[in-house]
Amino acid sequence: MNRILIIAGGTGGHIFPALAVARELREQEVDVQWLGVKGGLEEKLVPDSFPLHLIQIKAFRGKRGLQQLLMPLRLVRAVFQAYRIIRQFKPDVILGMGGYVAGPGGLAAWITRTPLIIHEQNSIPGLTNRVLAKMAKFILQGFPDTFPQNRKVITTGNPVRTELVKMPLPQVRLAARRGPLRILVLGGSQGARSINQKMLAALSSYPRSEEIAVWHQTGQRDFEFIQKEYEKIKIEAKVDNFISDMAGAYGWADLVVCRAGALTVCEIASVGVASIFIPYPHAVDNHQFHNARFLEQAGAAIIISEESLAETDLMRWFEQFAQDRDRLLTMAENARKLAKPEAVQRVIAQCKKFYAAR
């Protein structure tokens, strides 16, 4: 049986694409194991059916003083932990999908001479993948032009969940839809306080509340507060701290208001739905803005910077979209044209080149 070690952790933006690949690999009877970080989100999200190995590592950026001095020692420890796991499992190939774990995992792959493939989800590559790109056999990218083109660079798209790829086309879902404008609000897996606050401010002053329905993912921190506030402003709203049924949520929505993480952008393209992006302003290298531009330039999305965001901006867009369903449909169709539904298979095709090659 062929063996693959997947390296991914930290955030849903790394874990969910890796899970999409892992599930398809398991369908193909590949032995898949997972390398993550102790205390990371992967401990909650990776199913028990995938053996999960955990090492100890934290982010390098932003460390000062003693913490900064200790980072080299901690990196060496993490590389050694990953090295032992790789030597024990003996994978045919290692697939790095990002997160803090990718650095030590990728270095351990190089030390053990195990073929390494990396996948960069964002439009601007992170520091870890820029380093690992020199060691990797192939560099897979979710967006075109993330890395300079050479023989190792392949644009696969970002893997998304199968249930999203299989959703009906925008024309089927939206063409005959009537009733309130359905707004899906997402702040990423952890929620986004600024989006939560601006949404409430915009909707509390919206003149015709019957025109709006909301499904709002708040994150755990703001859940109870946001739920109570919707009750006060008399807007039809479903409030969740985390939405697990994303196919149901996207299928329900006419419009998505969200951050611009790579996974969210590619899910929106895969489904085909109009969006307003509010990129996280502190993202490394401003990569969320560049992710969002991928859809905005195609006429599929609106970008509003958080620095200039006012509740009147959101209210104005909501009023326009409530009166112009045709524009929503056009934006949704433009998004769908950019989808790469075969992304999972493209990633796996590169992994197959190293099956039983050792």
From Swiss-Prot:
CDD domains attached to this UniProt entry: GT28_MurG
Enzyme class per UniProt: transferase
UniProt keyword Lyase, yes or no: no
Reactions accelerated catalytically: di-trans,octa-cis-undecaprenyl diphospho-N-acetyl-alpha-D-muramoyl-L-alanyl-D-glutamyl-meso-2,6-diaminopimeloyl-D-alanyl-D-alanine + UDP-N-acetyl-alpha-D-glucosamine = di-trans,octa-cis-undecaprenyl diphospho-[N-acetyl-alpha-D-glucosaminyl-(1->4)]-N-acetyl-alpha-D-muramoyl-L-alanyl-D-glutamyl-meso-2,6-diaminopimeloyl-D-alanyl-D-alanine + UDP + H(+)
BP GO annotations: carbohydrate metabolic process; cell division; cell wall organization; lipid glycosylation; peptidoglycan biosynthetic process; regulation of cell shape
Pfam family, one: Glyco_transf_28
One Gene Ontology term, aspect cellular component: plasma membrane
PANTHER family in the record: GLYCOSYLTRANSFERASE, UDP-N-ACETYLGLUCOSAMINE--N-ACETYLMURAMYL-(PENTAPEPTIDE) PYROPHOSPHORYL-UNDECAPRENOL N-ACETYLGLUCOSAMINE TRANSFERASE 1
GO MF terms held by the record: UDP-N-acetyl-D-glucosamine:N-acetylmuramoyl-L-alanyl-D-glutamyl-meso-2,6-diaminopimelyl-D-alanyl-D-alanine-diphosphoundecaprenol 4-beta-N-acetylglucosaminlytransferase activity; undecaprenyldiphospho-muramoylpentapeptide beta-N-acetylglucosaminyltransferase activity
Principal place of residence: membrane
Species, as recorded: Coxiella burnetii (strain Dugway 5J108-111)
EC annotation from Swiss-Prot or TrEMBL: 2.4.1.227
Membrane topology: Peripheral membrane protein
Family listed: Belongs to the glycosyltransferase 28 family. MurG subfamily.
Gene this chain is encoded by: murG
List of residues binding UDP-N-acetyl-alpha-D-glucosamine: 11-13, 122, 161, 189, 243, 262-267, 288
Keywords: Cell cycle, Cell division, Cell inner membrane, Cell membrane, Cell shape, Cell wall biogenesis/degradation, Glycosyltransferase, Membrane, Peptidoglycan synthesis, Transferase
NCBIfam families: murG (TIGR01133)
Places the protein is found: Cell inner membrane
Family annotation (HAMAP family): MurG
Function per UniProt: Cell wall formation. Catalyzes the transfer of a GlcNAc subunit on undecaprenyl-pyrophosphoryl-MurNAc-pentapeptide (lipid intermediate I) to form undecaprenyl-pyrophosphoryl-MurNAc-(pentapeptide)GlcNAc (lipid intermediate II).
Protein name per its UniProtKB record: UDP-N-acetylglucosamine--N-acetylmuramyl-(pentapeptide) pyrophosphoryl-undecaprenol N-acetylglucosamine transferase
Keyword field contains Transit peptide: no
Domain of life: Bacteria
Pathway in which this enzyme or protein is active: Cell wall biogenesis; peptidoglycan biosynthesis
